[in-house]
Amino acid sequence: MLTFRFATREDVDLYFNWTNEAEVRNNSYNSSPVEYPDHVSWFNKRVDAPDCSLYLFLNEEGVPVGQVRIEKGPTGEGRRSVISISTDKQFRGMGHGTEMLQLASDDFLSVNPGYTIVAYIFEVNKASVKSFKNAGYVLTEQKEVKGIPSFIMEKKSHAEH
């Protein structure tokens, strides 16, 4: 069973290593490696932002296994937020993705009622599609995003079902 805490500035290097891991870059809409100074600036803005939740997941031994980020969209987009996930390569294939998505989504929606969480997933990323489906996300659209065939999946707070 996993637990989570919110990321702090001290987690910047852990997130940097995760974001530049080859499989993470391959499944990102921007596949270029991230430079450290750019990452530090990006990370520090988000860790302090009230519209961004950085969930850091730990296993029973307290070892970080992955992260989920949920960011509220711009004001003009209504009550929508975008989710992203990455799992440490040594913990992939163990079902942690589904558990992380469930825990983060449920926590976010419990403190942000009325929001819809939106996931953009490469069609070829079958593991992520399965994790999101198992975590209660519903396929709402299939389209190209930045030239890549993608699934758009959503999860709403229980009050909206």
Which residue ranges define each predicted feature?
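Acyl-donor (CoA/ACP) binding surface of acyl/acetyltransferases
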Residues: L2-L14, W18-E21, E61-H161
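An amphipathic alpha-helix signature
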Residues: R9-F16, Y36, V40, N44
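Conserved GNAT-fold acetyl-CoA-binding loop/helix
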Residues: E23-S41
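Juxtamembrane/interface motifs at transmembrane-helix termini
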Residues: V34-P37, R46-D48, T87
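Short, intrinsically disordered/low-complexity patches at protein termini
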Residues: D38-H39, D48-D51, E141-Q142, F151-M153
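A short helix-loop-beta-strand connector motif used in the catalytic cores of GNAT acetyltransferases and
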Residues: N44-L56
